[in-house]
């Protein structure tokens, strides 16, 4: 199986690249990013391009890929507000999805957010939900949406006091009865859930939409370990 990965330098994307590189089911991984990924390997072909406006053209030229995984995203703080967040989180992802469809990708995997909804009163979740809806409307043979809860892991940049505090609380209650409704998950668990679901065979000749909710991420990650652990 051949894969394209967007967001290979981020928290979930870095883990996804490492796992894809170690998985014997994956023959090649293509990435495009503003800076070089930390993970290297003989199966990885990385293009460094600081101008994200041309990423779609680069992706469109990558033929014969089976899976596209987007773990690309930002926060309103890092994007400088709502307008920047919309341009980056929605705009770049949607352009990449259209390019992937043009390139003949069969399965598109989007790492989204828990409670994402285009009808949400909250801008962040509303934007995530609109992106989900518009990617589903592209009608890939299969669209997979991963909706993790609070994301745990070592971030390179601070995402603000509220989010940092939420992450600390979530890390303390993970694997306890108090985890609800945060559904915390580590970056590698989210990555494994995305990859496991992408590796499953298509079940229909009609466009298929698969949602992996926050309650299912950890379970699906364990399924990856059970089936593919040591798959190098």
Swiss-Prot record:
Q: Which SUPFAM superfamilies match?
A: NAD(P)-binding Rossmann-fold domains
One GO term of the biological process aspect: import into nucleus
Cysteine disulfide links: none
Give a yes or no for keyword ATP-binding in this entry: no
Q: Which domain of life is it from?
A: Eukaryota
Compartments (UniProt record): Mitochondrion outer membrane
Cellular component GO terms, alphabetical: mitochondrial outer membrane
Keyword Cell cycle appears in the UniProt entry: no
Record's InterPro entries?
Him1/Fmp52 (IPR014843), NAD(P)-bd_dom_sf (IPR036291)
Q: Which UniProt keywords apply?
A: Membrane, Mitochondrion, Mitochondrion outer membrane, Transit peptide
- Give the membrane topology, semicolon-separated if more than one: Peripheral membrane protein
Its family remark reads:
Belongs to the FMP52 family.
Quote the protein name from its UniProt record. Answer: Protein FMP52, mitochondrial
The scientific name of the source species is Meyerozyma guilliermondii (strain ATCC 6260 / CBS 566 / DSM 6381 / JCM 1539 / NBRC 10279 / NRRL Y-324)
């Amino acid at each position: 199986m051949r894969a394209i990965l967007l967001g290979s330098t981020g928290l979930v994307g870095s883990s996804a690249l490492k796992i894809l590189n170690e998985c014997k089911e994956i023959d090649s991984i293509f990435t495009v990013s503003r800076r070089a990924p930390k993970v290297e390997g003989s199966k990885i072909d990385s293009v460094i391009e600081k101008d994200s406006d041309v990423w779609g053209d680069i992706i469109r030229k990558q033929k014969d890929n089976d899976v596209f995984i987007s773990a690309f995203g930002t926060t309103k703080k890092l994007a400088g507000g709502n307008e920047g967040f919309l341009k980056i989180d929605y705009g770049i992802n949607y352009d990449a999805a259209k390019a992937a469809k043009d390139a003949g990708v069969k399965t598109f995997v989007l790492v989204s957010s828990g409670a994402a909804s285009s009808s949400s009163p909250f801008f962040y979740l509303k934007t995530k939900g609109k992106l989900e809806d518009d990617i589903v409307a592209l009608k890939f043979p299969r669209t997979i949406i991963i909706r993790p809860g609070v994301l745990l892991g070592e971030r390179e940049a601070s995402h603000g006091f509220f989010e940092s505090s939420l992450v600390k609380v979530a890390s303390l209650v993970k694997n306890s009865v108090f985890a609800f409704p945060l559904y915390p998950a580590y970056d590698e668990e989210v990555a494994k859930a995305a990859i496991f679901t992408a590796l499953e065979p298509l079940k229909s000749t009609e466009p298929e939409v698969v949602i992996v909710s926050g309650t299912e991420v950890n379970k699906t990650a364990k399924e990856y370990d059970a089936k593919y652990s040591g798959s190098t």
